[in-house]
Amino acid sequence: MTRLALLSVSDKTGIIDLAQQLIHQFDFELISSGGTAKALQAAGLPVTKVSEYTGSPEILGGRVKTLHPRIHGGILGRRDLPQDTQDMETHQIHPIDLVVVNLYPFEQTIANPNVTVAEAIENIDIGGPTLLRAAAKNYAHVTVLSNPKYYDTYLQELAENNGEVSLEFRQKMAGETFALTNSYDGAIANYFMTLSSENESTLPSRFTVSGTQFQSLRYGENPHQQAAWYQTGTQPSGWAAATQLQGKELSYNNLVDLEAARRIIAEFNPQEPAVAILKHTNPCGVAVGNTLADAYEKAFNADSISAFGGIIALNQPLDKETASLLTKTFLECVVAPGCDDEAKEILTAKSKVRVLVLPDLMNGPKQTIKVIAGGLLVQASDDVIDTPDSWKIVTEKQPTLQQLAELLFAWKVAKHVKSNAIVVTKNRTTLGIGAGQMNRVGSVKIALEQAGEAAMGGCLASDGFFPFDDSVRTAAAAGIKVIVQPGGSVKDKDSIAAANELGLVMMLTGIRHFLH
């Protein structure tokens, strides 16, 4: 008995070859609609248009093509259920064994910043998801192919099973299809949520996130943990759009560290050279310099021991002078918005170092997500831009312009250090970083110990308020002259009084930057 296949695709990759083999090798007849039918006819292949098969023309400018009982009955009919087979015979519905459908490019459409709502709406597929879901639901009898990458595997299944398809394959394709339609509907829902929200940061009552596996990773944080890298959206963006110039395959930990490095370096104006060196998502050296090479040397020397095996982020294209410095130590990854040819040549001497070019270092996700038992925690990303103009001077002593610049630098770095976070800086270079301690004065002591005598005359930034005046007194004893912190403690007055007593400058930002 001749079998029917329904082909209706937006992405026509591989569709002609698939159709040819279905007809000539496996005795299929083809039903198709719209542009797919035209493409098959242009290739000289016999095809019945959906409108001819159903007896109903395409209407509403093509909005209604396949929504018909002869189509959906043929897909949904259960071949092992007498009542279904009787209904199909009564209504002259032929079983459809194969459904090949992919969807209108909605996500690509809305990726265009100039797209109108009307254009977006016309790229919401209705018939396609309906066909896919029907075929996936009836996978016991129907094969559904929702992506060209499955065509060859399907043909191989037919060849190896005397023209049949294994239940295991049909079930797998059903799962892939429901994942696709879920992702597609999620993208549409998120688009409408954005349209209806007065404030883009407002979180919806329903939150949908989905991704397509971009790359399998060797393992996760540890070798016993499985891991994979998923791309959100249909077009590569962010790290998926980066170019890796050399080095080994990126690991899970590399990607986590690279994103942390990107977030830090995005704080600094690309007109002014800046470099950040990280280990385990915490900065160990950050600096602004006269040149990129100068900034790197300052950041490296801030903690040369921790920089070994580190992740380097630069806010300007990598040049030969900086590349030469990078080859002097072992590094895991380097990312920059560009890399000149001389720098590329120099870096080949360290061929295992992963070197990436990510032109758009400044833009990242607008939300952060954490998975907890039974749910997700979603928050707006900590992208607030706070500058000394909005801060409050709370001490008798006033900061100089140079000190204001130093305070801002230290504050930007502290924002990206695990809480409790303390950062000691001078000349817009980190000298000591206290990260992740359970009490704030503990982080103060670590940062000051690391800075040593260089802390004299320096700046100290704290991501959270001081609960007591002990941190201020400890900082002053090490020679710190200016402090920036959020404020908000019930004992702020004690810290301010200590700062006045010890002749320090203190500014309160009014904004906290916890990072967990």
Curated annotation (Swiss-Prot):
EC number: 2.1.2.3, 3.5.4.10
Metabolic or biological pathway: Purine metabolism; IMP biosynthesis via de novo pathway; 5-formamido-1-(5-phospho-D-ribosyl)imidazole-4-carboxamide from 5-amino-1-(5-phospho-D-ribosyl)imidazole-4-carboxamide (10-formyl THF route): step 1/1; Purine metabolism; IMP biosynthesis via de novo pathway; IMP from 5-formamido-1-(5-phospho-D-ribosyl)imidazole-4-carboxamide: step 1/1
GO biological process: 'de novo' IMP biosynthetic process
Gene3D superfamilies, A to Z: 3.40.140.20, Methylglyoxal synthase-like domain
Entry keywords, A to Z: Hydrolase, Multifunctional enzyme, Purine biosynthesis, Transferase
Catalytic activity: (6R)-10-formyltetrahydrofolate + 5-amino-1-(5-phospho-beta-D-ribosyl)imidazole-4-carboxamide = 5-formamido-1-(5-phospho-D-ribosyl)imidazole-4-carboxamide + (6S)-5,6,7,8-tetrahydrofolate; IMP + H2O = 5-formamido-1-(5-phospho-D-ribosyl)imidazole-4-carboxamide
Keyword Chaperone: no
Recorded domain comment: The IMP cyclohydrolase activity resides in the N-terminal region.
Family stated for the protein in its record: Belongs to the PurH family.
Name of the protein this chain belongs to: Bifunctional purine biosynthesis protein PurH
Taxonomic lineage from the root: Bacteria, Bacillati, Cyanobacteriota, Cyanophyceae, Oscillatoriophycideae
